């Protein structure tokens, strides 16, 4: 029986894009190949809530060291030597340098090498001495967009033809909710009837600071979803509404209820927040950088990442033009329907089969 270990150590809420990717594959690949054994690798603290649903379906085993900790590499090698899989899928940039077995690695982007603000000596050394050499010896490599294929190829010296592009998906739970749900959400969260949503984090490349000079002059309040303390860290004043991390059900309502969803990140390997917002009918304004042009296409407004006035003008257009909002909402839903986690899982399983010499 073929045994495949899938790395799930980064799945701990609130889910960022890479964690959601790993979780969705672990949900969807095993039923496609019932004759294989799939095992999920989790951290030393055991099974987080987000993985509880998987426990009855696939075994979850612990790695004795934290994700990206100093002891991670020997602990990861020990866990894999104990499991003896035919294949290990490294679903993030944490690859097993001390385990020589068959590897499939997903390299989502190269931001720690490409961006000055994300670069450090430690990260550069890790990517150049660990990630790059081990990835070049992998059985197969996956990335999530044509943008990322170019970035990973350039910064890790990997031939672009070795990187198969398999796009992320969007779960069916991200859908256009009824107005009654939106009214209830606004009431529970103390939100006005009309607002602009901005999503990201305080990381520099998420670029939420571009909205700081214009936030007070927007035609509707700005609601920030970027982690606790982000408002102060990014220099926004008290007029900005800050939300704590939302469960998926309320994230859907946050997207759907916004006059516009502002996603100013200038370096995204894929851009899952923009895709999920479109699936919920939220009109999207995204930076014209990274993978956003690939993912959003003509279904949203793409504006220069670093131009506050361009963001203000786009927001004003959405606020004033009902037809534009309706058009972008419909186009976004249609665009998002082209991205499926089931399709991602099926294509990834084909990568496994080829890596094992089965096709």
Residue ranges, per PLM feature:
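Carbohydrate transferase catalytic cores enriched for Leloir-type hexosyltransferases
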Residues: 1-359
């Amino acid at each position: 029986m073929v045994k495949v270990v899938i790395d799930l150590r980064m799945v701990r809420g609130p889910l960022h894009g890479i964690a959601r990717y790993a979780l969705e594959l672990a949900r969807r690949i095993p039923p496609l190949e019932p004759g294989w054994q799939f095992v999920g690798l989790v951290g030393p603290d055991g099974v987080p809530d987000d993985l509880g649903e998987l426990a009855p379906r696939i075994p979850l085993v612990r790695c004795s060291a934290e994700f990206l900790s100093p002891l991670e590499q020997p602990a990861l090698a020990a866990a894999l030597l104990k499991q003896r899989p035919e294949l290990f899928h490294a679903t993030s940039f944490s690859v097993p340098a001390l385990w020589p077995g068959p590897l499939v690695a997903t390299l989502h982007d190269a931001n720690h090498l490409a961006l000055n603000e994300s670069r450090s000596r430690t990260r550069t050394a890790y990517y150049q001495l660990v990630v790059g050499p081990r990835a070049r010896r992998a059985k197969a490599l996956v990335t999530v967009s044509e943008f990322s294929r170019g970035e990973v190829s350039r910064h890790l010296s990997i031939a672009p033809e070795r990187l198969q592009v398999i796009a992320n998906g969007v779960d069916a739970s991200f859908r256009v909710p009824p107005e009654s749900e939106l009214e209830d959400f606004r009431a529970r969260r103390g939100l006005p009837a009309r607002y602009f949503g901005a999503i990201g984090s305080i990381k520099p490349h998420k670029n939420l600071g571009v909205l700081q000079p214009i936030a007070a002059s927007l035609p509707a309040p700005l609601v920030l979803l970027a982690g606790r303390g982000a408002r102060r860290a990014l220099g926004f004043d008290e007029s900005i509404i800050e939300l704590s991390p939302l469960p998926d059900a309320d994230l859907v309502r946050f997207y759907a209820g916004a006059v516009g969803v502002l996603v100013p990140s200038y370096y995204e390997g894929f851009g899952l927040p923009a895709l999920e917002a479109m699936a919920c009918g939220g009109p999207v304004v995204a930076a014209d950088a990274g993978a956003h042009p690939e993912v959003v296409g003509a279904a949203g407004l793409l504006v220069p990442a670093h131009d506050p006035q361009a963001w203000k003008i786009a927001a004003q257009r959405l606020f004033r033009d009902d037809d534009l909002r309706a058009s972008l909402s419909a186009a976004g839903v249609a665009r998002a329907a082209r991205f499926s986690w089931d399709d991602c899982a099926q294509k990834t399983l084909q990568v496994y089969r080829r890596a094992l010499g089965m096709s």
